[in-house]
Amino acid sequence: MAVAYGNVYVAQIAMGASPQQTLDAFLEAEAHDGPSLIIAYSHCIAHGINMRYGLRQQKLATDCGHWPLYRFRPASNGHAQEFMLDSAAPSIPIKAYAYNEIRYKMLTYTHPEAAARLLDVAQQDIDQRWSVYTNMAERWPARSAAPARAASSRQALSEVS
């Protein structure tokens, strides 16, 4: 929805899926002259996973398409807006991700038919959203990395170290 405003930098990230994309999103959001929104996948104990495997679960969420990684850069300085779809196409079924979490698995114990039906609906939703995101990436292709952005990334990294 924030992408529809046209002036908001928007990124969806998951550090466990792509630390580099996470860093790029924060640097780009900070450099953006306007509002920025970063939507981060954050595992928590309420998901019903062993927290030791949180980053792995983030990667599974991305690999199945439940949490695609993307960045939207609004038009600026004469450059057209860009939508970068940073994750690959879904490569595993949502079941491989969802049933690692008690919050999803519980329904299989009490109402297995409903759980199977809802999992099918979730997979259909993933497929539909992926189609929308690939369409956006084709409509607003990314230009090559701007030297100014690369320079600001180097500067930010040198300030951290």
Language model segments and positions:
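Conserved acidic/glycine
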Residues: 55-161
